[in-house]
Amino acid sequence: MNARFGPTHNKQSASAGKPQPALVVYAKAKEKIVSDISKRNSNKSDFSDGNSNPASVTVFHVGPEDQDLRTLADILNRTDWKLCPGTRWTLAASDDVSAAAARLTGETVPIVLCERESVAGTWKDVLESVGRFPAPPMLIVASRTADEYLWAEALNLGAYDVLSKPYHPAEVVRVLSMAWLHWTNHRTPAARAQAN
């Protein structure tokens, strides 16, 4: 019996013939679930272009160029996107809401990450602008003061999610991966044709 993790698991180890601690069994089960999700996604949703070139996913950041933006860039560059195999993530940015809206008009961008308040506007202004696009991006609000009120307001007005700052890599990867999958699965046929 392990005092911290409880009794050993009853299943016998195939390789050693000894009982495995519950923690080891849990870790192996978690690893298998992640592996199964990756296999299912790679079989069902290969985001490459058919020539084994990864799909490029652009995250457009609206807000100041600060340490948080550099952290976000590092997360995008160093992450293995297990939920979105066959993707390459890039970051574009603008610190001005009106300039961002103008730039987004000419591009197909799946995800917009917007600071709660930015130069000459708020996330609500960006949401209103991108809401008119044929394939509107998933808007994610970022804030150091992310609370239940902001989360409820953002979701009720049509934002996809809220990320708290400073950015935590696992949470950023989870939210961005789910936003990308949601965007690709809900695009209209007309928007798909326009993007291709």
Q: For each predicted feature, which ranges?
A:
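Conserved acidic segment of CheY-like receiver
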Residues: 54-77, 90-93, 112-113
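C-terminal output helix
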Residues: 167-176
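CheY-like receiver
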Residues: 26, 33, 41, 55, ...
